[in-house]
């Protein structure tokens, strides 16, 4: 499948991605890390939370580089110019694409999320 994540990572490169076993495993590892970082019931010290967050960021960067085929220099540019929120959205986009979701469906989903967030802010 062809994937271009310019909207998230600011690099105009279309990658021809095959969801290999290693890529799917890395995507799953990232998803698990993201879910664990949101688990508010799990007792974690602040230090462990910071360590886990740093490990998750490294895993996410490895995943993006592996899927998109970015060079180390391109990854350095991404890390210096893209916010952590936008980077996380880009990782989510790549995972959805690897799961077979179309660009059109992803765009629709993102629009619904933004509207829900805007509605939540305006109702406060």
Q: Residue spans of the language-model regions?
A:
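An amphipathic alpha-helix signature
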Residues: 57-61
């Amino acid at each position: 499948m062809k994937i271009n994540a310019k909207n998230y990572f600011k690099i105009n490169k279309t990658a021809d991605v095959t969801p290999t076993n290693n890529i799917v495993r890395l995507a799953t590892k990232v998803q698990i890390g993201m879910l664990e970082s949101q688990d508010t019931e799990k007792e974690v010290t602040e230090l462990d939370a910071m360590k886990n967050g740093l490990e998750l960021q490294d895993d996410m960067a490895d995943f993006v580089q592996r899927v998109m085929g970015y060079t180390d220099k391109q990854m350095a540019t991404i890390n210096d110019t893209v916010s952590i929120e936008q980077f996380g959205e880009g990782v989510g986009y790549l995972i959805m694409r690897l799961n077979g979701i179309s660009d059109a469906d992803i765009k629709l989903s993102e629009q619904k999320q933004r509207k829900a967030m805007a509605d939540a802010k305006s109702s406060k």
